[in-house]
From Swiss-Prot:
Function in brief: Catalyzes the conversion of glucosamine-6-phosphate to glucosamine-1-phosphate.
Pfam families: PGM_PMM_I, PGM_PMM_II, PGM_PMM_III, PGM_PMM_IV
Cofactors, names only: Mg(2+)
Domain of life according to the entry: Bacteria
EC numbers on record: 5.4.2.10
Molecular-function GO term, any one: magnesium ion binding
Family: Belongs to the phosphohexose mutase family.
Active site: S102 (phosphoserine intermediate)
Annotated GO CC locations: cytosol
Identification of the protein by name: Phosphoglucosamine mutase
Matching PANTHER family: PHOSPHOGLUCOMUTASE (ALPHA-D-GLUCOSE-1,6-BISPHOSPHATE-DEPENDENT), PHOSPHOHEXOSE MUTASE
Amino acid sequence: MGRRYFGTDGIRGRTNESPMTAEIAMKVGQAAGAHFVRGEHRHRVVIGKDTRLSGYMMESALVAGFTSVGMDCVLLGPMPTPAVAMLTRSMRADLGVMISASHNMFADNGIKLFGPDGYKLSDDDETAIEARLEKPVKLAASADIGRAHRVESARGRYVHAVKSSFPEHLRLDGLRVVIDCAHGAAYEVAPLALWELGAELISMGVNPNGVNINDQCGSTDTRALQDKVRETRADIGIALDGDADRLIIVDNEGRVVDGDQLMALVAVGAHRRGELRGGGIVATVMSNLGLERFLAEQGLSLHRTKVGDRYVVEAMRAEGFNIGGEQSGHIVMTDHATTGDGLVAALQVLAQLVESGKPASELLHQFDPLPQLLKNVRFAGGEPLKDEKVIAAIADAEEKLTGTGRLVIRKSGTEPLIRVMAEGEDKRLVEAMVDQICDAVRKAA
């Protein structure tokens, strides 16, 4: 049976519409709290959020839910998703919660859950929590209701942890860095960490007002960052998304560097230092075939998973890899973090930039990607991928791309979208096949 609330990255949707209502958020708090109340000790949950307007409402609803079943709440305020994961483990909490819709606009919000080890919950845990949402709740006795308090030291603790991932013998002195925080969760901690390491810093996207998160800024819209890098003659530009678990880089010439290129860079660097485990990296089916070929030339493998950084992390843990990620900019380095951390990843890139002495435009473009095209088709309902004409269009494209490329068609786990991606050596064929499938999906939807 399909899950009603949880998608590929927790629960997400438009605020004040199911499942992102205060009522459901309170029930999630109760259900998750009940699921993680184990033993006789006092239970705690760490809660962070990004800067969107609805964060206050969702935070209050979750606190009501958790405290009603006897869990104490540690409130971090606006903090990156990886900070919540790190502090959940550091504070020995039973559960961590991030209130964010990541790269989505302010009208959406979401709930991501982390276990006491700082890793995102498994499908089994999420399914168990979802099952509890439909059952009666056992509330705590009056004397056992949980308490809530805010922790003011959270920012400093996270900045310290992030900086510890940067080589001690290096500094960023003399490096002109433009950072775009997307008016999101990292608007304070990211500039602070870079400044403390000595960077000549130019900050953008650091004035959140509740509705401007990810609005023409951040990792999903780098145009302003590209312009600023060129205008200021910066050495590099850093773009984070709303909850700072993604990283996209802009080189000194204003060109965008995606997650595939960044994974190639950090993997080769780690391999050279003897620090790469697993004999390669983990990425999703969306990563470019050029990355796979490049790694093979270095004697390294690419292990692919379905889309979602949590599935990347699960494969990394199961197979013994320590570097993985997604083309979209989730870069996971389990030597430093339990989930994608845009700031940690940025520091690893900056470390290699400083050590190499090369300009970013020369260092960061590790391989020539194959022509790749991704288009999204919005649909109102139903199952357009089961339509006969859509199935036929996909089969035709697969046949024509056999041996020279790949085709990935999937339903988004966070939005009502069908994502159509094709790549291959023939750019015109790739474009034609994507358009062919998108047209069929639109007619079916």
